[in-house]
């Protein structure tokens, strides 16, 4: 979450007249995250989240995200639900941006995830993947392997400003990934952005998944790989096998990875690291002036990619390569 677009109090009050969520008491921007503009609203009827969708979210994709959240919630996945206007609409416009209000989900995201948190997210991810199997809508992933080189083209000329040699490193890795990316693994609905700040806990109990604007249809194990990178590294950049084992074991108790998925997981993790390296690289080189946003460090994912390049098999993540896991 972040704030790119400012919203005047009078404009917001007028916008809220279309909803039955009470009168506005206060609102504040949420600076965490990098993609959309978010505000925490306090009204006479409770707390809500207002999201203004920015550059990477097309307005025509919003029905997919919003319908998906309703679909998942109906199947027991805890996630926020959009508030409808008095006319039954779930998407409006504010400050020139598509805007949605969702209910406030209780809990906090873990600043220092532990193995219990990792097990919780593994279990929830498997549940989400299974719940999404009968979701009727389809959205291709614009940030999968076919979208990485266009992203690189946006940043290539200045990549070495971030780190000398980064341009050649990325170019070589893209060649490797594009030539080996798996085409026949199980697919379905994925979250595609399940970082710690998109998962809420109350104590050690997972209370909900949030922030679905990157959800799409893609390789299910790719979603697992994104989580390995997002949850299982320490602040000193060391990979924590205990966390990885907890995440993978919990996921496989809900949905076992096939032999082909297990074999492909290290490559998928390289691709997942590349995706976030590239989007962060583009973002850090193009922060709008005056934006209340904290760009994420692209070199964090450069280091994770370097680690994943040396992973030989799923055993390096702390689990056995075949059969049931403990």
Swiss-Prot record:
It catalyses: L-homoserine + ATP = O-phospho-L-homoserine + ADP + H(+). It comes from Rhodopseudomonas palustris (strain HaA2). Its EC number is 2.7.1.39. This is Homoserine kinase. Coiled coil: none annotated. Keywords: Amino-acid biosynthesis, ATP-binding, Kinase, Nucleotide-binding, Threonine biosynthesis, Transferase. Belongs to the pseudomonas-type ThrB family. Pathway: Amino-acid biosynthesis; L-threonine biosynthesis; L-threonine from L-aspartate: step 4/5. It comes from the Bacteria. Transmembrane segments: none annotated. It is an enzyme of class 2 (transferase). One of its GO terms (molecular function) is ATP binding. NCBIfam families: PRK05231.1 (NF003558), thrB_alt (TIGR00938). InterPro entries: Aminoglycoside_PTrfase, Homoserine_kinase_II, Kinase-like_dom_sf, Pseudomonas-type_ThrB. GO terms for biological process: threonine biosynthetic process. It holds the Pfam family APH. The keyword Chaperone does not apply. SUPFAM superfamilies: Protein kinase-like (PK-like) (SSF56112).
């Amino acid at each position: 979450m972040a704030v790119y677009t400012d919203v005047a109090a009078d404009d917001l009050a007028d916008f809220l007249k279309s909803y039955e969520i009470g009168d506005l008491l206060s609102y504040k921007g949420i600076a965490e995250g990098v993609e959309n503009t978010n505000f925490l609203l306090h009204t006479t009827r409770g707390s809500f989240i207002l999201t203004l969708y920015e550059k990477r979210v097309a307005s025509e994709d919003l029905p997919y995200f919003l319908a998906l959240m309703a679909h998942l919630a109906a199947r027991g996945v805890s996630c926020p639900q959009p508030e409808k206007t008095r006319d039954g609409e779930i998407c409006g416009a504010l400050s020139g941006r598509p805007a949605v209000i969702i209910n406030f989900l209780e809990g906090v995201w873990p600043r220092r995830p532990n193995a219990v948190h990792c097990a919780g997210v593994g279990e929830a991810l498997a549940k989400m993947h299974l719940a999404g199997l009968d979701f009727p809508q389809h959205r291709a992933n614009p940030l999968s392997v076919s979208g990485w080189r266009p992203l690189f083209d946006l940043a290539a000329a200045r990549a070495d400003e971030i780190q000398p040699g980064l341009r050649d490193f990325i170019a070589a890795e893209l060649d490797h990934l594009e030539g080996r990316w798996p085409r026949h693994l199980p697919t379905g609905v994925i979250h595609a952005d399940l970082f710690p700040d998109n998962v809420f806990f109350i104590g050690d109990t997972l209370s909900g998944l949030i922030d679905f604007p990157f959800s799409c249809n893609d390789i299910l194990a790719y979603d697992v790989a994104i989580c390995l990178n997002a949850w299982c590294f320490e602040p000193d950049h060391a990979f924590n096998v205990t966390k990885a084992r907890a995440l993978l074991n919990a996921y496989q108790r809900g949905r076992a990875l096939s032999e082909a998925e297990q074999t492909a997981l290290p490559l998928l993790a390289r691709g997942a690291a590349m995706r976030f390296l590239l989007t962060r690289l583009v973002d850090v080189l193009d922060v709008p002036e005056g934006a209340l946003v904290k760009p994420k460090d692209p070199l964090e994912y450069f280091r994770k990619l370097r680690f994943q390049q040396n992973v030989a098999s799923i055993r390096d993540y702390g689990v056995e390569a075949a059969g049931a896991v403990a």
